Structures are given as structure tokens and as C-alpha cells.
Swiss-Prot record:
Function: Nucleoside triphosphate pyrophosphatase that hydrolyzes 7-methyl-GTP (m(7)GTP). May have a dual role in cell division arrest and in preventing the incorporation of modified nucleotides into cellular nucleic acids.
InterPro entries, per the entry: ITPase-like_fam (IPR029001), Maf-like (IPR003697)
Source organism per UniProt: Pseudomonas syringae pv. tomato (strain ATCC BAA-871 / DC3000)
Pfam families tied to this protein: Maf
GO biological process: nucleotide metabolic process
Catalytic activity: N(7)-methyl-GTP + H2O = N(7)-methyl-GMP + diphosphate + H(+)
Principal EC category: hydrolase
The gene coding this protein: maf-1
Active site: D69 (proton acceptor)
Cofactor(s), names only, from the UniProt record: a divalent metal cation
Protein name, as recorded: 7-methyl-GTP pyrophosphatase
One annotated Gene Ontology cellular component of this protein: cytoplasm
Subcellular location per the Swiss-Prot or TrEMBL entry: Cytoplasm
Site label Important for substrate specificity, positions: Y12, Q70, E154
Cross-referenced Gene3D superfamilies: 3.90.950.10
């Protein structure tokens, strides 16, 4: 079996991949994550997932390289990582009592053959109606400034959701394991 490499510095993705009980290494790719003019959110996450994997291919020959990228989309607009309390509060206020779709791009690159499988896995959450006090309590408790849309679903962020809809709940955290297993099997990896 080729060695697995997770092209990410995300501890959330690392924890998810560890669930598969396959040995893997992690390396953070250095790419430009800018949104291109006219690029749809769906196309953006697929491109970035692929570019993250490709950025490490020359350093890791003989590897299966996993790239992933996620955005939250509200009314057609991308909600990126907020980075600040103020921006996170704005995002959550806008998302109150709406549906937010998380798009997770996934790429599996075989650095030996150059073959790259790419997909986008959607997951939708219906947000509770949130008042400013509950938003601020959540932000102070969870500090989700490195999470798309200010949602840290693997923690207290789940309390913001009224309901969820999607084929793979792990995509909400940033690495759709069901789809990844399909890709790994196609590459001849035995899971479990």
C-alpha cells in the first residue's frame, strides 16, 4: 500500500483521518487560497483540495496525498474563516434561523501515477434562531475563528443547529470519510 499523506495542518482533519486506523503523515501545503473571479464555491473547494495535494506531490513520491478544503455558503455567499470575534459575530448573526451549506472539497492524488480523484461533498445545517447573547457566549466558549462560517461542529457549535442534512456528517468537520474511503478503495487500499 502506498503511504498516506494528509495535506493539512488541521487538527480536526487529522483526528478524523485517524478514525480509519491507517498509518499516515501530515504536511501543511503552501498554496494561494484566493477565490478566483467567477469561481463558484463548489469549484473553489475542489480546486483548493486538488492544489493542496499537488503542492506536496514532488516531495512525497509514492504517496496517496489527501487534500481537503471547506467553505460555508449562505445565500450564495462564501463565509470563510472569520479570524476575529467581530467577524464571527457578524457571520453568526447573518446565519441565524437560515440554512447554511458546507461544501467540502476532497482530493486523493496518487503521486506515482498523477491520477487525482476529486469531489465536493455538501452538508446543510438549519440554524436555530440566535440572539446576540447566545452568539457571544458561544464565541467566548469556543473561539471558532479558524472554522469556516464560525461553526465548530465537533464542539459546542452543534448547539447552534436545529437540524442537519447530508450523506456524510464528517464532511461538516472538514474531511468526508465516507467519500474518502471510496477513493482509497479505488486506489487498492483495504479499509478496514
Amino acid at each position: 500500500m502506498p503511504s498516506l499523506l494528509l495535506a493539512s495542518s488541521s487538527p480536526y482533519r487529522r483526528e478524523l483521518l485517524a478514525r480509519l486506523r491507517l498509518p499516515f503523515a501530515c504536511e501543511s501545503p503552501d498554496i494561494d487560497e484566493s477565490h478566483r473571479p467567477g469561481e463558484t464555491p463548489h469549484d473553489l473547494v475542489q480546486r483548493l483540495a486538488r492544489e493542496k495535494a499537488e503542492a506536496l506531490a514532488s516531495e512525497y513520491p509514492g504517496h496517496l496525498i489527501i487534500g481537503s478544503d471547506q467553505v460555508a455558503v449562505l445565500d450564495g455567499q462564501i463565509l470563510g474563516k472569520p479570524h476575529t470575534f467581530e467577524r464571527a459575530r457578524e457571520q453568526l448573526t447573518a446565519a441565524s434561523d437560515t440554512r447554511v451549506t458546507f461544501l467540502t472539497g476532497l482530493a486523493l492524488l496518487n503521486s506515482s501515477t498523477g491520477e487525482c480523484q476529486v469531489d465536493c461533498v455538501p452538508f446543510t445545517v438549519h440554524m436555530r434562531e440566535l440572539d446576540q447573547a447566545s452568539i457571544e457566549r458561544y464565541l467566548r466558549a469556543e473561539t471558532p475563528y479558524d472554522c469556516a462560517g464560525s461553526f465548530k461542529a465537533e464542539g459546542l457549535g452543534v448547539s447552534l443547529f436545529r437540524s442537519t442534512q447530508g450523506a456524510d456528517a464528517t464532511s461538516l468537520i472538514g474531511l468526508p470519510l465516507i467519500r474518502l474511503v471510496d477513493m482509497l478503495i479505488k486506489e487498492g487500499v483495504s479499509v478496514p
